[in-house]
Curated annotation (Swiss-Prot):
Protein name in UniProt: Gene product 8
UniProt function note: Targets the host DNA sliding clamp and inhibits host DNA replication.
Keywords: Host-virus interaction, Inhibition of host DNA replication by virus, Modulation of host cell cycle by virus
Superkingdom per UniProt: Viruses
The organism's taxonomic lineage, starting at the top: Viruses, Duplodnaviria, Heunggongvirae, Uroviricota, Caudoviricetes
GO biological process: symbiont-mediated perturbation of host cell cycle progression; symbiont-mediated suppression of host DNA replication
Length: 71
C-alpha cells in the first residue's frame, strides 16, 4: 500500500485485480479494467455504480497510480 501526501491511498486488490482509491482509510472508488477491453473504468464502491464524473476520476486515479509507479 502506498501512502500519498494528500490524505488518500491507492491499494491493489489482488483478488479482483483492481485498484482501490481510499480517502482517509476508507475505500471510495475502484479502478478496474473491462472484461473484454483494455479500458479502465471507475466504480463507486458503496453504490456499485459508475459516478457521473467517471472519466475525470479515472484519469486522476490513473495519474496518481503512475506518479507512484503503481500502474
Amino acid at each position: 500500500m502506498e501512502q500519498l501526501n494528500y490524505g488518500y491511498k491507492i491499494k491493489r486488490n489482488q483478488v479482483r485485480g483492481s485498484w482501490l482509491f481510499l480517502v482517509y482509510g476508507k475505500p471510495i472508488y475502484e479502478l478496474h479494467r473491462g472484461e473484454k477491453s483494455k479500458t479502465y473504468y471507475v466504480t463507486h464502491i458503496a453504490t456499485g455504480k459508475t459516478p457521473a464524473c467517471a472519466g475525470l476520476l479515472r484519469d486522476a486515479i490513473m495519474k496518481a497510480c503512475m506518479l507512484e509507479g503503481l500502474l
